[in-house]
Amino acid sequence: IETTQGCILIDTAHNPAGAVALRGVLSEQFADVRPTLVIGMLADKDWQTILATLAPSVSRVICVSVGSGRTLPAAELAKAARQHCDDVLTAESLADGMKMTGGDVLTVITGSVYLAGEALEWLGQTGGESQRDLNEWKT
């Protein structure tokens, strides 16, 4: 999505295969840019592998918590991200994290379908917050 502050790429890479595919797109389509990665993940996903796949190829990682009870705390995600990238920040929310991007040429938002939905809401591209509840399975 092109904005006045730069390009935002939203991807739902929430598993290792998705992260590999995203890394491929970044290296092929944006070879001359080291993007900022805004990432938030659910604790029950393979977040260590996803970070190891994506973080080495970005200039900065901004870790955020996802709007789900299953979220991995941003601080825990950031601790792991520091093993792969020198510039790692944490934010309480996607909105706060996006303020930290400073209008970078390319910002990649990824790690969770929930986070992708939050990003679309933040950009004014969706119907509303209530749609997020559709993915919260109750037994």
Where are these regions (language model features)?
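Short, flexible loop segments at boundaries between secondary-structure elements
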Residues: V66-R70, S130-T139
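C-terminal helical cap/extension that packs against the catalytic core
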Residues: C7-L9, Q48-L106
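Active-site catalytic pocket residues across diverse enzymes, especially alpha/beta-hydrolases
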Residues: L26, F30, A81, L123-G127
